[in-house]
Design a protein with these regions (language model features):
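Short extracytoplasmic
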Residues: 44-67
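Beta-lactam-recognizing serine transpeptidase/beta-lactamase-like catalytic domain environment
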Residues: 61-63, 222-264, 269-505, 509, ...
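Hydrophobic alpha-helical segments, especially N-terminal targeting/anchoring helices
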Residues: 48, 55-56, 156-163, 167-169, ...
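Short pre-catalytic segments that frame enzyme active sites
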Residues: 30-44, 64-67, 72-81, 177-189, ...
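Hydrophobic alpha-helical transmembrane signal-anchor segments
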Residues: 1-31
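Small/polar-residue-rich segments within soluble enzyme cores
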Residues: 65, 85-190, 501
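Short loop/turn microsegments at loop-to-beta-strand junctions
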Residues: 49-51, 214-217, 458
């Protein structure tokens, strides 16, 4: 009996095993099950990434400053209900929801109760309130196109922080219940390029220049050559670059690096050369409003003439004919060499793809023509320079004769603490201290001691020189279109900063550029710079 029962059980087990084997064989041979089996495993969703930062001198980021939220959702009924009020694009959300698989969506909040929702706070490369566009540049298709984004493209793109969520899924891509998801948060991006720019001074300049239709503002540290701000106008909208390309005002040009006629600012170089050739402030000349040079008539802006004046008075009055006369006593080669020492005619490389134009400086052959030398004496004719060049030579005057090569990049950082690989400061003496002090006095007379100057700040003291540069272009009323300039330094008690403002096609320097210069100094003084 026992044997018979064992035989029956054995037969039953064999039948059950055979049935199971046949069932497994059918499953294995079924293409749908084979395909589903191959898909089983893990499924990772990336939820935003961050590339290397671009920092100012104080490690304040100029990019990645604003944030948006992304959520990865495993679409259970409870999770789908909780996240719905915070969805930015509901059409896209519903389109993904129908598949029942985990997916990524843009949301307005980063806080959710459901375990099936994982939210991330992701930096926006360029937010609505971003600044310094002409310095940072922009990207397209994940690559830097211009500015620092282009110059340091490989480094910035190699530094990447990525957020992700990984699920264990079945053959149809649906998250398996009871198996914990893996969440990876890329964390704060610390690697980046460190600039000499001061974010707050840059913001002040962009605010002060809000009414400049076309132009540029540059601020430098006179002791190091560090560029603290470089604002170009008009700015452009990073979300609408096609419009910027077609804009007749060319907003994509960085006008701080572009060359223009300099005008009366160059009278400081003429004065410097005169000092170094033995002339002094007592050199006098009677301005009658115009003067003839080699058959060409040169007019002063005061057609009635300034009368008898010395160099200090001529600088304050910006008398063209005085400096034409002064230049006659300067050796031609020495005149050119003096301008070169002050950076005129020399380009200024800042980073790959970012170089201030060398402009144009008259040659020795040019100055053999008396009329061309007359033009150069007050910054007209063939003479061209970029606002950054003008700011750099202003630094040399304020820094007692030491010329600092402008610098934009301090280096790179991997930890937001240490900086390496930057260009060192380059400082050269270009005039003696006495000459620098005498030029400072001329600039003080032109602004701080000039009641007609619109550049005098109400809460500080500054020195400077304005320019109104002729362009030989005229408006519909026949009035000549001019560029307005001012360059100067402050505070007088202990000079620290040089400021240069250009208003392209803006008119008289004292009318368009000087008030901007004044506002910048007042705002910087208010925040104790």
């Amino acid at each position: 009996m026992m044997y018979k029962r064992m035989t029956i059980l054995s037969v039953v087990f064999m039948l059950m095993f055979s049935t199971l084997y046949l069932r497994l064989f059918v499953i294995v041979q079924n293409e749908e099950y084979v395909s589903a089996g191959k898909k089983q495993g893990t499924y990772t969703i990336n939820a935003g990434h961050t590339n290397g930062n671009i920092y100012d001198r104080n490690m304040n980021s100029l990019v990645n400053r604003e944030y948006e939220y992304y959520a990865v959702i495993n679409p259970t009924p409870e999770a789908a209900e909780e996240i719905l009020p915070f969805i930015r694009d509901k059409d896209e959300y519903y389109g993904s929801l129908v598949y029942g698989k985990p997916f990524l969506c843009s949301v307005t909040s980063g806080k959710f109760k459901s375990e099936d929702i994982t939210a991330f706070k992701v930096p926006v490369r360029y937010g609505k309130n971003s600044i310094a566009h002409h310095i940072t540049g922009y990207t397209a298709n994940g690559e830097g196109v211009c500015g620092i984004e282009y110059a340091y493209n490989d480094f910035l793109r190699s530094a990447e922080s990525v957020n992700s969520v990984t699920y264990t899924v079945n053959g149809y891509g649906t998250a398996l219940d009871g198996i914990k998801k893996d969440v990876y948060n890329g964390g704060e991006m610390k690697s980046g390029v460190v600039l000499t720019i001061d974010r707050y001074i840059q913001a002040i300049c962009e605010l002060a220049g809000r009414n400049i239709k076309k132009g540029a503002i540059t601020v430098m540290d006179i002791y190091s050559g560090d560029i603290l701000a470089m604002a170009s106008f008009p700015d452009y909208d990073l979300e609408n670059l096609d419009k910027a390309v077609l804009d007749e005002d060319s907003p994509l040009i960085n006008r701080c690096l572009y060359s223009y006629g300099v005008g009366s600012i160059f009278k400081l170089v003429t004065a410097q050369a005169a000092f170094e050739q033995g002339l002094n402030e007592d050199f006098s000349y009677c301005c009658t409003g115009s003067v003839e040079v080699d058959g060409q008539i040169f007019k002063c802006h005061d057609l009635g003439g300034h009368g008898e004046q010395n160099m200090t008075e001529a600088m304050a009055n910006s008398c063209n004919t005085y400096f034409i006369e002064l230049s006659k006593h300067i050796d031609n080669q020495f005149f050119i060499d003096t301008a070169k020492r002050m950076g005129f005619g020399m380009s200024i490389p800042l980073a790959s793809g970012m170089t201030a134009s060398g402009g144009n400086l008259q040659t020795l052959e040019d100055l053999e023509l008396p009329a061309e030398k007359a033009n150069m004496s007050f910054g007209q004719g063939k003479l061209l320079a970029a606002p950054l060049q003008v700011c750099a030579f202003t630094c040399a005057i304020a820094n007692e004769g030491n010329y600092c090569v402008p610098r934009l990049v301090k280096g790179i950082t991997d930890d937001k603490i240490t900086v390496s690989g930057g260009e060192p400061e380059k400082i050269t003496r270009v005039m003696d201290r006495e000459t620098a002090f005498r030029l400072q006095d001329l600039m003080i007379a032109a602004v701080d001691k000039n009641p007609d100057s619109n550049a005098r700040p109400s809460n500080n003291h500054a020195a400077g020189k304005t320019s109104t540069t002729q362009t030989a272009r005229f408006d519909e009323d026949g009035t000549e279109i001019c560029h307005g300039w001012i360059t100067g330094f402050f505070p007088l008690s202990s000079p620290k900063y040089a400021v240069t403002v250009l208003c392209e096609d803006g008119g008289y320097g004292n009318d368009c550029a000087a008030p901007v210069f004044k506002e910048i100094i007042e705002r910087m003084t208010n925040i104790n710079y």
